[in-house]
């Protein structure tokens, strides 16, 4: 089992009866191949493989001082009977499972782990983009079907594909991941533009454009923004109709940033070229989601929310959570998202 790298593993000097009661609600969210034993440095740890229902959350947090979670809802309903909770530590960067205002009213600090998966999410962004732009599913199938062995020439390129060089790469969300993607896109020879949903971006390295310009000019459009009232269904039917018919959409942000029904219709009607998704509206993918009916892997590739989940990234995530707890117990604020 892989242990967390980079954490200081410093034991705090506290009496045994002062140690925290810590609950890990979704141990499986970081994978069973990555150790969470370091958390035991801080007290009595109760570990659950997964926590699904509201009742499970309520029962499991009721005596906890520290709650470590990923997707479990942590709000008034689930926390009102948990008087001792002082810290919620996300095994994630996202924290939309937490009611930050309620937690603040209770004096509960919420922390997240930042920048642990930047490299991996950027890498996966291009894995999707390259697979779709080069029609790799088609050509892999062509070889494995025996057609390549049966043909009378050395090469086959029956479905045209294009280079990244010289294309325009549009980005929504110029944070750590967006900036990393921008640098890689530049290395491929792309022109990078971006749109700031809030209008408050301080990035001066790339041209900031309005939303319509982003949609109409981008050959590749990748999403790296959090889910908020401003970004929910940001990519809807109206937005998709403004994109190039050859454009490739990549969503490694949050599923509900894209209207999945509108995307399905845009792909079926060939309003855009292709889409690569690591997230969908409701996860796991529901059979009723129309995207589940689209089987053409040259037009649509969906991966099961794994862009963040390399072994290295998951190990850094545990280490980051460890450091957040250690800082909290020293009376310091580290990665607190509801100050």
Task: Go through each PLM region and give its residues.
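N-terminal glycine-/charge-rich "phosphate-binding" loop or analogous flexible N-terminal tail
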Residues: 2-7, 11-66, 193
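Rossmann-like dinucleotide-binding domain for NAD(H)/NADP(H)
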Residues: 246, 252-339
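Phosphate-binding beta-alpha-beta segment of Rossmann-like dinucleotide-binding domains, i.e.
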Residues: 114-168, 180
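Glycine-rich Rossmann-fold phosphate-binding loop(s) that bind the pyrophosphate
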Residues: 174-175
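Short, well-ordered coil/turn residues at beta-beta hairpins
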Residues: 25, 70, 91, 224-226, ...
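Rossmann-like adenosine-cofactor binding region
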Residues: 75-79, 193, 197-290
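Short beta->alpha connector loops at strand-helix junctions that form conserved
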Residues: 49, 91-92, 108-119, 196, ...
């Amino acid at each position: 089992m892989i242990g967390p790298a980079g954490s200081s593993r410093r034991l705090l000097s506290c009496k045994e009866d002062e140690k925290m009661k810590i609950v890990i609600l979704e141990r499986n969210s970081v994978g069973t191949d990555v150790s969470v034993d370091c958390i035991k440095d801080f007290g009595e740890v109760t570990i659950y493989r997964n926590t699904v229902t509201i009742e499970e959350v309520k029962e499991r947090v009721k005596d906890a001082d520290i709650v470590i979670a990923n997707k479990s809802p942590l709000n008034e309903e689930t926390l009102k009977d948990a008087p001792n909770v002082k810290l919620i530590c996300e095994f994630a960067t996202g924290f939309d499972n937490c009611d930050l205002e309620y937690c603040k009213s209770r004096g509960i600090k919420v922390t997240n782990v930042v920048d642990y998966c930047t490299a991996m999410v950027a890498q996966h962004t291009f894995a999707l983009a390259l697979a779709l732009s080069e029609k790799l599913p088609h050509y892999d199938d062509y070889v494995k079907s025996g057609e390549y062995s049966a043909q009378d020439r050395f090469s086959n390129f029956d479905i045209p594909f294009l280079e990244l060089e010289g294309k325009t790469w549009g980005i929504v969300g110029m944070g750590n991941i967006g900036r990393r993607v921008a640098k890689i896109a530049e290395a491929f020879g792309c022109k990078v533009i971006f749109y700031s949903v809030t209008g408050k971006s301080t990035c001066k390295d790339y041209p900031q454009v309005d939303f319509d310009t982003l949609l109409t000019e981008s050959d590749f459009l990748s999403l790296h923004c959090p889910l908020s009232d401003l970004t929910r269904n940001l990519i809807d039917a109206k937005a998709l109709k403004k994109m190039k018919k050859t454009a490739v959409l990549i969503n490694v942000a949050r599923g509900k940033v894209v209207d999945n029904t509108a995307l399905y219709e845009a792909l079926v009607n060939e309003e855009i070229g292709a889409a690569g998704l690591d997230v969908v509206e409701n996860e796991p993918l529901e059979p009723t989601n129309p995207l589940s009916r689209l089987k053409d892997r040259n037009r649509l590739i969906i991966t099961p929310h794994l862009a963040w989940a390399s072994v290295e990234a998951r190990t850094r995530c545990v280490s980051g959570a460890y450091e957040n707890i250690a800082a909290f117990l020293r009376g310091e604020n580290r990665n607190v998202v509801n100050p």
